[in-house]
A protein has these predicted regions:
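Membrane-lumen/periplasm interface segments of specific transmembrane helices
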Residues: 21-23, 193-295, 311-327, 380-392
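Transmembrane-helix signature of polytopic, membrane-embedded enzymes
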Residues: 92-114, 132, 147-151, 155, ...
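Membrane-interface transmembrane helices that cradle and orient dolichyl/undecaprenyl
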Residues: 137-152, 187
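Short acidic/glycine- and proline-prone juxtamembrane loop motifs at membrane-interface regions
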Residues: 122-130, 166-169
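Membrane-interface alpha helices of multi-pass inner-membrane proteins
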Residues: 108-109, 139-140, 152-167, 174-178, ...
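Transmembrane-helix motifs of polytopic, lipid-linked glycan transferases
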Residues: 79-99, 132, 136-140
Length: 558
């Protein structure tokens, strides 16, 4: 018996071995989200906290370690990200083991290791750390909810506040955690309003202590801004709505900021909601049903129900907020109408897997309600798989789940049909349908999404391009040159930002031109060194410092 238990416990190593495999697949991938990766590396490695536009000071503090790695800083980045990804796998196991058997918890952790959230390990971005911190916050929230003292809710807020110093977008989830604490405490205390309010206040206070207390410790008064350089949400939205002549899409038709805000927000909300229903429609509908039941009943919230209510609150809040954020950015002049950003809440994917396996724990809806729910999920799945590929740009900057699986419309529609068939089977036979969806359909879609996203990413950035060589070849000559005295001239943002990333200095200027352009002296009046990419000439006194295939570094002579 003891030997059997030891053999079973050895299974705990399986998800971590799978995580290492996922990491190895993207280990050699080169920078892929160029503008963001350049901004984050510049902040973390080269700028004081008070001068950073994004208030992700904990991320910058930890990633600043890569300064000690020299030219190998990108490998160090992936090592740090790997630690946080493996932490996410472990934390997911700890969440699952609260509700499931040991073997099924190992299964959940294994699916997490093989899910699309492994992709950001390759990036110099906060995503992997953010996913880990949000998973930690969910786990801590579930743990403290079982305790008898309202004061422990502070722990949930402290963790969420720390997460906001990794990625400020965590602040969008504060209402979800406050509402959850309020409802949970209210039900647990037999409708005691004071204890419910105290729990919600405790979460808020904990958040404010870490978000602004540590923020001030890092960056002084600059650390007291809620969203860093973005300002206040109300001010940002008001300014965007008041904008005039905003051009969206390829039709070149100018519209008012308010019209763009409403149009993009509504269409993107529908797209985000449809994407979530494709990935986890049955568990999410159950989560909404459980949440409604919790509000109606006077009974304390059960442990399993707590997970569903918390995930429902986070999902609903993030779908709405991210759609509004995309609309705000578009109305402000940076067209995001063709971008669907799921990466702000892809950390929920492991929780969807746990919820899928918990479906059999709940009483099935009556057939009429199953037909209604199933019809909505099927319609949303087919709508999204048809609408997404031709409408949205498949950027890794926006999501890890969709770029691979959504690259081919025909294949994506097949995925929609695959999910829809499972939902129809669930309508007819809910007992077996729950098992099929939780144990097979959802994990299969996630693993498929990972492999296809990895394959596409490796195809795009798995081999060094000439502009990678340009960054490597010029870096050593520019080590002691301030970034604002360097200019990179190229034909695409990808080329230019890749070179800036590898040079690894803050505030490097850039200029986009067409093939065969000649750069005049006026363009480089505030630069001492210029990197040119491709067939680009210069018309000013200069000295060639170094050159290679497709690039040249020149010193401006005055």
């Amino acid at each position: 018996m003891v030997a059997k238990l030891r053999a079973e416990h050895a299974l705990i190593f399986v998800p971590f071995v799978l995580a290492l495999w996922s990491i190895s697949r993207v280990w050699t991938v080169l920078p892929s989200i160029m503008q963001d990766e350049y901004i984050y590396t510049s902040q973390a490695k080269n700028l004081p906290f008070a001068e950073q536009f994004y208030s992700n000071y904990l991320f910058s503090l930890i990633m600043g370690i890569t300064n000690s790695c020299g030219d190998e800083f990108y490998a160090c980045t992936k090592t740090i990200n790997s630690f946080f990804f493996i932490s996410t796998v472990l934390l997911t196991f700890l969440i699952a083991i609260r509700f499931l058997t040991f073997r099924w918890s190992v299964f959940v952790a294994s699916v997490t290791a093989l899910s699309p959230i492994a992709i950001p390990v390759s990036y110099f971005m906060p995503e992997t750390m953010y996913f880990s911190m949000m998973t930690l916050t969910i786990w801590l929230t579930l743990v403290v909810s079982k305790r008898d003292t309202w004061l422990l809710w502070v722990v949930s807020g402290l963790s969420l506040g720390a997460t906001a110093l990794v990625k400020p977008h965590a602040v969008f989830m504060l209402p979800a955690f406050v509402i959850f604490a309020f409802i949970y405490a209210y039900k647990k205390s037999a409708s005691n309003w004071l204890k419910a309010i105290a729990a919600g206040v405790a979460v808020t206070v904990g958040f404010l202590v870490t978000k602004f207390g540590l923020g001030f410790a890092f960056a002084g008064t600059e650390g007291l801004k809620l969203f860093g350089g973005y300002g206040t949400p109300v001010g940002a939205l008001t300014g965007a709505a008041a904008a005039e002549d905003v051009v969206v899409g390829t039709d070149s038709v100018a519209r008012s900021g308010l019209e763009v805000l409403i149009t993009v927000a509504s269409t993107h909300f529908l797209a985000h909601a449809s994407a979530m229903l494709l990935l986890a429609g049955i568990p999410l509908f159950l989560a909404l049903r459980v949440s409604y039941s919790v509000v109606k009943t006077k009974q304390p919230i059960g442990e399993v129900s707590a997970l569903f209510v918390l995930v429902a609150l986070i999902t609903v809040s993030m779908v709405g907020v991210v759609a509004l954020f995309e609309a705000y950015v578009t109305a402000s002049g940076d067209d995001h109408s063709d971008r669907l950003i799921l990466r702000y809440y892809e950390f929920l994917i492991p929780q969807f897997v746990v919820m899928g396996l918990l479906l059999p724990r709940f009483t099935d809806s009556k057939r009429l309600f199953r037909i209604i729910q199933g019809s909505i999920i099927v319609a949303a799945s087919m709508f999204f798989t048809i609408y997404y590929p031709p409408t949205f740009d498949k950027q890794y900057a926006d999501a890890s789940t969709l770029p691979g699986i959504g690259d081919s419309q025909g294949f994506f529609i097949f995925v929609g049909i695959f999910v829809s068939c499972a939902v129809i089977f669930w309508i007819v036979n809910p007992e077996r349908g729950n098992l099929v969806i939780g144990r097979f359909i959802m994990p299969a879609v996630l693993i498929l999404a990972l492999v296809m996203s990895q394959n596409k990413l490796i195809e795009i950035n798995g081999t060094p391009a000439y502009f990678d060589q340009a960054g490597w070849g010029t870096r050593e000559f520019l080590e002691d040159v301030p970034g604002d005295r360097i200019m990179v001239v190229g034909q695409t943002r990808t080329e230019v930002f890749t070179v800036k990333f590898w040079i690894d200095e803050a505030n490097i200027k850039d200029l986009l031109v067409v093939e065969g352009s000649v750069i005049a002296a006026d363009n480089v009046s505030e630069s001492d060194y210029v990197v040119t990419l491709g067939n680009i000439g210069v018309d000013f006194a200069h000295e060639v410092v170094t050159e290679g295939e497709g690039y040249k570094l020149v010193k401006v002579l005055r």
